[in-house]
Amino acid sequence: MEGFNIGGKSLKSRLLVGTGKFASYDLMKQAIEGCGTQVVTMALRRVNLDHKEDNILEYIPKDTILLPNTSGARNAEEAIRIARLSRAMGCGDWVKIEVISDQKYLLPDNEETVKATEVLAKEGFIVLPYMNPDLMIAKRLESVGAAAVMPLGSPIGTNKGLQTKEMIRILIEEIKVPIIVDAGIGKPSQAAEAMEMGAEAVLVNTAIATAQNPVKMAKAFELAVRAGRLAFNGVTAPQAKVARASSPLTGFLHEGEA
């Protein structure tokens, strides 16, 4: 499968994996290694440099790109502060912007997300903003320096799939930076659907971490993402209004009847 580019970094795996909700760090590590992801996202509060056994970084493969998120930020100012702290702690320049002031549905605040993205992009961060799919917001994020745009498929942790499919389709058509579908993808088939639409990648956490067998589920998502991308490149066949037989319905059975 061909690669894609984020912030000057070439990636082969189109599956990004979140690290929350796993029963243990060991299980998380097995899932990450088993699916071959190159980018993992994590909350900064789980980085504990003073206690090695409690430090999530000890369980993430060293060749994996860290994508710290600004989970807990309620406005742009808090997101910016978390991103700067992450860099100071040695977690790199990549950051996933999450600005959520709504505590019921956990929907991102698009306006505050744009503000944070603009500031951090100017400071040299590779910014991947999580956002409610809206074309004008996506264009603004692109214009202020977002390295990719991460529209939600459905609310975080719901596993409801691509409820915003048509809005995401518009972003795929109109936005030049990579579109990475994030949040709500609950099944490998839903990940494949996102890839068939033309998304560059998907980010999955809850559906893997809370599965009965997270390691197998992570592998299933890897294969689904690969299949979806292959289908996109192959260009799926158009729908027909009426039935069309794949083999002739007449011919040799009636030869010689005339």
From Swiss-Prot:
Homotetramer. Forms heterodimers with either ThiH or ThiS. Keywords: Cytoplasm, Schiff base, Thiamine biosynthesis, Transferase. The lineage of its organism: Bacteria, Bacillati, Bacillota, Clostridia, Peptostreptococcales. The active site is at 96 (schiff-base intermediate with dxp). InterPro entries: Aldolase_TIM, Thiazole_synthase_ThiG, ThiG. The gene is thiG. Transmembrane segments: none annotated. It catalyses: [ThiS sulfur-carrier protein]-C-terminal-Gly-aminoethanethioate + 2-iminoacetate + 1-deoxy-D-xylulose 5-phosphate = [ThiS sulfur-carrier protein]-C-terminal Gly-Gly + 2-[(2R,5Z)-2-carboxy-4-methylthiazol-5(2H)-ylidene]ethyl phosphate + 2 H2O + H(+). Signal peptide: none annotated. Pathway: Cofactor biosynthesis; thiamine diphosphate biosynthesis. 1-deoxy-D-xylulose 5-phosphate binds at residues 157, 183-184, 205-206. Belongs to the ThiG family. One of its GO terms (cellular component) is cytoplasm. GO terms for biological process: thiamine diphosphate biosynthetic process. It is found in: Cytoplasm. It comes from Alkaliphilus metalliredigens (strain QYMF). The keyword NAD does not apply. This is Thiazole synthase. Catalyzes the rearrangement of 1-deoxy-D-xylulose 5-phosphate (DXP) to produce the thiazole phosphate moiety of thiamine. Sulfur is provided by the thiocarboxylate moiety of the carrier protein ThiS. In vitro, sulfur can be provided by H(2)S.
